[in-house]
Amino acid sequence: MANTSLQDRTVIIAGAAGGLGAVASAAFADAGANLALLGRSLDKLDELAGDLKLPDARILTQAANLSNAQEVEEVAKAVMKKFKRIDVLLNFVGGWIGSKEVLSTQKADVDSMLDQHLYSTYAMVQAFVPHMLNAKWGRVLAVSSPNASRPPGNNSPYAIGKSAMEALLLSLAQEVKHSGVTANLVLVRTIDMAHQREISPSEENKSWITPEEISATLLHLCSEEAAMINGARVPMFGEPL
């Protein structure tokens, strides 16, 4: 059985206030981790922190624009001041601007997706990973989509943003190999949540996945038994890549 105890480790959860972030926060808290919850809305982060019912010594909330490198550096300082270490980054930051044909896509659409998916990831990697390398242990994990490598029509800004983020983390995986730090991606299509079922009530849900299933996989990738998994794109939609 994998050792998924994260006792005394510090896990940064970016995009924590979303549905997946909330479930992952609970799962990683149950595994013993200290949590740094990041997002844009401090009110939502504080609400989540209250729901988790962790002692103050084990939780920190920080509101920031995560695509702003200076703000992310300040977050890193706050996390290190409180917990003295950064061990895991869970990156759930992202967004979608809707279906658009290539010929009707504006530069601002692409810039928005790069900002949300790529530049936020760059800022966090550059601020947090040096602390992992100093400790000779760390996990960088992000959620992506099969659309990054197999983009459908009418979705190019999103596919561009996700594929750029994947390129960054796969490059990082090469650069940190054999250091004790790993970088991996889990690929999902639709996360099975109440609001998604309201949007698509007639879906067969064959490729949908729950936040709990995603969180369990992320926990495994943080285990000691997963130390040799690096640079992986883990498909979590019931089909091969």
Question: PLM features: residue spans?
Answer:
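Rossmann-fold scaffold of SDR-type NAD(P)-dependent oxidoreductases
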Residues: A14, I86-G94, H117, A142, ...
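Conserved glycine-rich cofactor-binding loop
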Residues: A17-G19
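Conserved glycine-rich Rossmann-like NAD(P)H-binding loop of the short-chain dehydrogenase/reductase
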Residues: A33-E47
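Conserved mid-core segment of classical short-chain dehydrogenase/reductases
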Residues: E73, K77, K81, W96-D111, ...
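Amphipathic alpha-helical dimer-interface segment in Rossmann-like NAD(P)H-dependent oxidoreductases
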Residues: K77, K81, Q116-A135, A173-Q174, ...
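Catalytic Tyr-X3-Lys loop
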Residues: D87, L103-A123, W137, L141, ...
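Catalytic loop of short-chain dehydrogenase/reductase
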Residues: M113, R139-A164, L169-H178, T190
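C-terminal helical subdomain
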Residues: H178-V181, L185-R189, M193, P201-L241
